[in-house]
């Protein structure tokens, strides 16, 4: 007589369905969390894009207002028979025009401090008493002047690189700028342009983040007497607003 097989379910058979249900529930919860996180991230990104766009509009209005004020001050001065002299600039753009030969140690040290390591390197510098004295020492080896908004913007858009973990990274995405400067409320390239151009409270951090610009030799070449001072027909030293036309030739 054959022994009837047991109909009592084993321990594995009893708990297998429950474990499968738990696994399925966990997977479902995980999927829901991922969907919710993705939706939250998308909403945050949209909000950030709107903030960046709003800031850009605000900056544009600010730049236009400042330009109108300068024009009006000039007109008023002329109407009164005077000559309008703008406030001394807070920002200069400095370009190294000479190589490493025959540069005295003090001037060489200042060039290193300014991060002008190679010929045709360019940097934004806050113009104050200390940097003014430094630039006077290195005048024979650099040229510098007052960059306008167009120059600042074109430099950053066309030749802008950031320093990320000591690496030279192209500023191709606002996320790169935000990761480095977000704690200073600099989230986009337009924020960066504004901070540099207006010499804002976080100028030092912004300028140090920007890798020294590597420019090309100017279209048409340097002047024949390149190392003479600009006012003597050369290229060295202070050139005020004429730095803008030079930068255009070097982009």
From Swiss-Prot:
One example of a Gene Ontology biological process annotation: endonucleolytic cleavage in ITS1 to separate SSU-rRNA from 5.8S rRNA and LSU-rRNA from tricistronic rRNA transcript (SSU-rRNA, 5.8S rRNA, LSU-rRNA)
Question: Which keywords does UniProt give here?
Answer: Cytoplasm, Nucleus, Phosphoprotein, Ribonucleoprotein, Ribosomal protein
Under InterPro entries, the record lists: Ribo_uL30_ferredoxin-like_sf (IPR036919), Ribosomal_uL30 (IPR039699), Ribosomal_uL30_CS (IPR018038), Ribosomal_uL30_euk (IPR005998), Ribosomal_uL30_euk_arc (IPR035808), Ribosomal_uL30_ferredoxin-like (IPR016082), Ribosomal_uL30_N_euk (IPR012988)
- Principal subcellular localization: cytoplasm
Q: For bias kind Basic and acidic residues, which ranges apply?
A: 26-40
What's the superkingdom here? Eukaryota
Which PANTHER family does the UniProt entry name for this protein? 60S RIBOSOMAL PROTEIN L7, LARGE RIBOSOMAL SUBUNIT PROTEIN UL30
Assembly, per entry: Component of the small ribosomal subunit (SSU). Mature yeast ribosomes consist of a small (40S) and a large (60S) subunit. The 40S small subunit contains 1 molecule of ribosomal RNA (18S rRNA) and at least 33 different proteins. The large 60S subunit contains 3 rRNA molecules (25S, 5.8S and 5S rRNA) and at least 46 different proteins.
Q: What protein am I looking at? A: Large ribosomal subunit protein uL30C
Organism of this sequence: Schizosaccharomyces pombe (strain 972 / ATCC 24843)
